[in-house]
Amino acid sequence: WEESVRPLLLARQSYALHSLTLRVLGGESNLEYRVRALLENPNPTAAIYCKTGECEIRITARARSDEDGEKMCRAYAKKFYDMLGDAVYDEDVAGLEETVVHTLQEKGLTIATAESCTGGLIAQRLTSVSGSSEVFGYGFVTYWEQAKAKLVGVDPAVIEKYNVVSAPVAAQMALGAAKASGADIAVSVTGVAGPTGGDEVRPVGTVYLGAARDGVAYVKKLFVSRPDRALVRARAAQAALELALRLAQGKVPADTQALAKSARHDAAALTALDSTFLKG
């Protein structure tokens, strides 16, 4: 027993666990549908954990050594990358803000924020990352209409014509924040966080996001169907950080409409931008 059976049993019980966490943009239901087949593997295993505006895929391998476990996790992670593409934005990080800051650092870029309904939440998330002072210097909280005009150059006539919660205002906020700060990238948010303030055209949960780089603003509309103030603000901040990441990576953010800086006061261009989102 001591010389043969016991050593054999101990050897069979000896194993190491290694884990790798993929951070994925988007909701859980859509993600689970896309990767369902990969969640049924016995070793490595994979499980989805839902967060606001994103998910974690935790891959865990059981192996004879940590090195072997890492290789197994890495090989299995490639299957998720192949299936999900750049929806997988990073590995083993605390959150999207960490990836945004690190990407800006790697690219030698800076960022500014212009926030209304999020009230500084985007800036708070960015500055929670150690070293963020290298890339983030200006955060404008422009809750009042006059603050939007004074601090980031939103035209009061644009607010009056299109509403403060609109694509033209989000575009002007982003372009204005970039100009006022001198940052390479600027993101903006204007919306109705609730529980009051909505109407038929812009119900509670309606948010417009802007992101500007190289003289072009990219605008996106977000609608959070559950009228929960904290959730609307959290989802808006997450979506703004996603726009920032794509611009930092040199990509055009998906599902956005562009407005050039040269057209920020062009009535026809602003009306076309506004109409695009209202039709949707």
Task: Tell what function each PLM region has.
Residues 68-280:
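Short alpha-helical segments enriched in small residues
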Residues 52, 63-64, 213-215:
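Short acidic-glycine loop/turn motifs at beta-strand connectors
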Residues 1-53, 58-60, 68-73:
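Accessory alpha-helical/coil subdomains and C-terminal extensions
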